[in-house]
């Protein structure tokens, strides 16, 4: 999803772009509040993303090295500048009483991001995964457990009590086009949809709602998306993605044909800036055609 957001920012005025990001992966660690999904979007939009696909380019890891020397079990690797970013978020929360949305807006202003990166809620929601090893928070499952084991359960703890921020609802209601990015439907998008009011806002929105399939050439390029879809008894294909989103969608963009709803069949790999911009333009063109 972050790559496509960057492509969108390259073909439209970034100030017109709002990205609603999952906070179910958030974690409190090293005395800081780490918010991986919103930060990933921000770093992509600022052209600061490292070639590994996470963290800041040319970041150093002196703090992690220092913690190891002190006997700390460092299982979540965070660069020095990345940690500074997260510590500043925590400071703004505790000292200035800023919520996640306002704090991230302040951080993004400092790195020149003009798009609106919006945490899905001001309230805490955490994704937990169950395998044969028991229940784990998302980051522990992904990193410490290396996403090993068959997924037996998925919970978005706190979602029922959470509410979408005013900024999220306003972005949905005022959008000309709504795109669900090619992220893991179960792990990255479902936590957003689990916040009461967001699914309903998407259904009621006047703009067309499209999804870009994360399945490319019959495979998932990144992460354990296939394992999550298997847990939900979904086919790992664009049809499976369409089945998961159901009534939310007016159309889907994929590199394979989808029979159940209007589809744009095109290449969806985003290996470079040109490919990201091309896909963004195609998605927007498809949305415009659907809106007629």
Predicted regions and their residues:
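C-terminal functional extensions of proteins
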Residues: 221-292
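Electropositive, gly/pro-rich neighborhoods at or near active sites that engage anionic ligands
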Residues: 22-156
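An anion/phosphate-binding loop that grips the pyrophosphate of nucleotide cofactors and donors
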Residues: 175-176
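Active-site glycine-rich loop that binds ribose-phosphate moieties when present
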Residues: 152-172
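Short connector loops at secondary-structure junctions
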Residues: 212-224
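A short, Lys/Arg-enriched amphipathic alpha-helix followed by its capping loop at the start of a domain
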Residues: 3-16
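A short helix->loop->beta-strand "cap" motif at the edges of active sites that frequently abuts
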Residues: 13-15, 205-209
